[in-house]
């Protein structure tokens, strides 16, 4: 049987772990060929703590290069041998959130869309993935680079010579997030507890979700990968929750959720969900 191949397209270092980390580890453990393409170096990220604060964009502006090392370490924890960057490391700069001033380097959202699409399409033709994973049209939570990564990936899948059998969006389950936030255990005292009502941009209904992967067996790998992104992510001592620079406490969910954007679904369970992104494909 042909070896399964999966490609994950993400906007910044750490996104691969935050949204699809356990999925990546799962398919690597199954013997699949897994590649991660990151579109920027995450130069505009907010730095947690004082140790690496001088790397930030308003100081030395060296964060992007440092985050290559973080990404490399995180991918190693997930079983991926090396990072890949769209157009090469540093080709397009992190765009920052809405309102972030443009820098000298061309931002990802301002780049030549045709060039970006052709570059990713060439990678798809090289890697020939059976499954491609990226964000939904809102980029998960509205970040301009996530939205742009969705658009570029969608266009590249359509433009590539290789016919990708299945395209998925990584999404959050509204019901699972609400339950996990409500039942979350002790967190560091400086973290901020919120409810699902405080996170209006997050979440899909159960009816809108197509796949849910129970990845409990790979949560330790995901937590180790989260810890590798130390300038961006703080992880609780017990590994059950994490926070970004805003100190909002979020659960480490053992299940990762997906919407099938293109292709045919395989077998579904009693909830109407696939439990394997490779379901319906003749690959191992």
From Swiss-Prot:
Any single biological process term in GO:
mycothiol biosynthetic process
In alphabetical order, the GO MF annotations are: N-acetylglucosaminylinositol deacetylase activity; zinc ion binding
Binding residues annotated for Zn(2+), in chain numbering: 12, 15, 146
Task: Give the record's cofactor note, including how many are bound.
Answer: Binds 1 zinc ion per subunit.
Q: Is Metal-binding one of the keywords?
A: yes
E.C. number? 3.5.1.103
Q: Which UniProt keywords apply?
A: Hydrolase, Metal-binding, Zinc
Which InterPro entries is this protein grouped with? GlcNAc_PI_deacetylase-related, LmbE-like_dom_sf, Mycothiol_biosynthesis_MshB
State the reactions this protein catalyses. Answer: 1D-myo-inositol 2-acetamido-2-deoxy-alpha-D-glucopyranoside + H2O = 1D-myo-inositol 2-amino-2-deoxy-alpha-D-glucopyranoside + acetate
Which cofactor does this sequence's record say it needs? Zn(2+)
Q: Which Pfam families match?
A: PIG-L
Known function: Catalyzes the deacetylation of 1D-myo-inositol 2-acetamido-2-deoxy-alpha-D-glucopyranoside (GlcNAc-Ins) in the mycothiol biosynthesis pathway.
Stated family: Belongs to the MshB deacetylase family.
Q: What is this protein called?
A: 1D-myo-inositol 2-acetamido-2-deoxy-alpha-D-glucopyranoside deacetylase
User: Which species is listed as the source?
Assistant: Mycolicibacterium vanbaalenii (strain DSM 7251 / JCM 13017 / BCRC 16820 / KCTC 9966 / NRRL B-24157 / PYR-1) (Mycobacterium vanbaalenii)
Which gene does this sequence derive from?
mshB
């Amino acid at each position: 049987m042909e070896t399964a191949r999966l490609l994950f397209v993400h906007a910044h270092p750490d996104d691969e772990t935050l949204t699809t980390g356990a999925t990546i580890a799962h398919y690597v453990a199954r013997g699949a060929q897994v590649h991660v393409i990151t579109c920027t170096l995450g130069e505009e990220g907010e730095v947690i703590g004082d140790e690496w604060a001088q790397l930030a964009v308003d100081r030395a502006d060296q964060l992007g290069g440092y985050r290559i090392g973080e990404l490399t370490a995180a991918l190693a924890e997930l079983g991926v041998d090396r990072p890949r960057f769209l157009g090469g490391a540093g080709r397009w700069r992190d765009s920052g959130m809405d309102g972030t001033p443009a820098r000298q380097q061309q931002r990802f959202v301002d780049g030549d869309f045709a060039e970006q699409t052709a570059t990713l399409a060439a990678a798809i033709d090289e890697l020939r993935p059976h499954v491609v994973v990226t964000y939904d049209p809102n980029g998960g939570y509205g970040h301009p680079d996530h939205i742009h990564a969705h658009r570029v990936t969608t266009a590249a899948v359509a433009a590539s010579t290789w016919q990708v059998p299945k395209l998925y969006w990584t999404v959050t389950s509204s019901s699972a997030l609400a339950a996990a936030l409500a039942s979350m255990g002790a967190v560091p005292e400086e973290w901020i507890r919120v409810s699902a009502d405080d996170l209006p941009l997050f979440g899909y209904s159960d009816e809108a979700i197509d796949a849910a992967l129970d990845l409990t067996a790979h949560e330790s790998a995901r937590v180790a990968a989260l810890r590798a992104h130390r300038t961006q992510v703080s992880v609780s001592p017990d590994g059950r929750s994490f926070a970004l620079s805003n100190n909002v406490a979020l659960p480490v969910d053992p299940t990762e959720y997906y919407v099938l954007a293109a292709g045919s679904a395989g077998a579904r369970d009693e909830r109407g969900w696939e439990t394997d992104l490779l379901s319906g494909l003749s690959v191992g």
